[in-house]
Amino acid sequence: MKRLVIMAAGTGGHIFPGLAIAETMKARGWQVSWLGTSHGMERELVPKAGVEMDIIEFSGLRGKGLQHTITGAFKLVASFATCFSILKRRNPGIVLGMGGYVTVPGGWMAKLRGVPVVLVNADAALLLSNKTLMPVAERVLFGFPADFGPAASKALVTGNPVRQEIISLPAPAERYAQHSGPLKVLVVGGSLGAKALNDAMPLALAMLPPEQRPVVTHQSGKKNIDALRANYAQAGVDAEVLDFINDMPRRYAEADLVICRAGAITVSELTAAGVASVLVPLLVSTTTHQRDNALWMEKQNAAIHLPQSELSAQGLAELLQGMTREKCKQMAEAAYANGRRDANAAIADVLEKLVKIT
């Protein structure tokens, strides 16, 4: 029996690609389990997908003050012992790190047990957790071509894993031909929401005459749903507001335009499905990954790059007013032309080559 432990924790950007690989490997007859935490999105999403999960109590060491750092250090030490015990019990032939701090103790303990370690790196630049695991990794699978630096000898560009339901959507020309009526806009701030989009979108729609307003579905993030609903009510605008979208493939299929962040997994999904987008990169002082992703998409005529520093209700209203379904379709087709729909199989093939039969 071929056994895989997937290590991933935190946000949807780590969890959904891992679930895509879990589905692929189970279809190939593998036994798959998950190593995660009790406080990340994996706690809810992984069991729903029918994947067994083991939990460690660790959430990283950076930020949040001295007490958090000290407590985190003790939890890190304990997590190594817990991971060793879990891996002994699960007896995997290979482990796959998708990102998040959970991969660090899991990866090192896998190496100690002689289990091959493969890492997925969604962005062109190395994740901090993957840098930490570089000495023990057999392969590092990148979502995008880049200067791989210290990972060069182990690097392989496979593209990012995307859920099969997204890959299997009809091509943009077929989908957009079936759309009619007002534009349908999907606003997604990532699995945790995005306050900048939550603030600007209701005001932007209020500036448009009712007959020119698109039909909007807006994912708020669980912590922001009440505030966002209040924003729409105060603006006098109707919108479908959801804390989390469980049926994203269907939402992509129905949308003419997606307004969202520019994370690597989001971009991979938009290009795999072929959906037009307005990309508002997350402002992070230490990286430019999302900005680079948005600029690349804009260069392919697949998206509009809207820096958060330039995001305003007035500007967003003008952008929406000038948007047509034909323009959206053209961007969607450009996105589709740049999509990789073979990443799941490419990653699965790497795992097949490196696995130890247990």
Swiss-Prot record:
One of its GO terms (molecular function) is undecaprenyldiphospho-muramoylpentapeptide beta-N-acetylglucosaminyltransferase activity. Keywords: Cell cycle, Cell division, Cell inner membrane, Cell membrane, Cell shape, Cell wall biogenesis/degradation, Glycosyltransferase, Membrane, Peptidoglycan synthesis, Transferase. GO terms for cellular component: plasma membrane. InterPro entries: GlcNAc_MurG, Glyco_trans_28_C, GlycoTrans_28_N. Pfam families: Glyco_tran_28_C, Glyco_transf_28. It catalyses: di-trans,octa-cis-undecaprenyl diphospho-N-acetyl-alpha-D-muramoyl-L-alanyl-D-glutamyl-meso-2,6-diaminopimeloyl-D-alanyl-D-alanine + UDP-N-acetyl-alpha-D-glucosamine = di-trans,octa-cis-undecaprenyl diphospho-[N-acetyl-alpha-D-glucosaminyl-(1->4)]-N-acetyl-alpha-D-muramoyl-L-alanyl-D-glutamyl-meso-2,6-diaminopimeloyl-D-alanyl-D-alanine + UDP + H(+). It is found in: Cell inner membrane. Pathway: Cell wall biogenesis; peptidoglycan biosynthesis. Its EC number is 2.4.1.227. Its main location: membrane. It is a peripheral membrane protein. UDP-N-acetyl-alpha-D-glucosamine binds at T11, G12, G13, R163, S191, I245, Q290. Cell wall formation. Catalyzes the transfer of a GlcNAc subunit on undecaprenyl-pyrophosphoryl-MurNAc-pentapeptide (lipid intermediate I) to form undecaprenyl-pyrophosphoryl-MurNAc-(pentapeptide)GlcNAc (lipid intermediate II). Belongs to the glycosyltransferase 28 family. MurG subfamily. This is UDP-N-acetylglucosamine--N-acetylmuramyl-(pentapeptide) pyrophosphoryl-undecaprenol N-acetylglucosamine transferase.
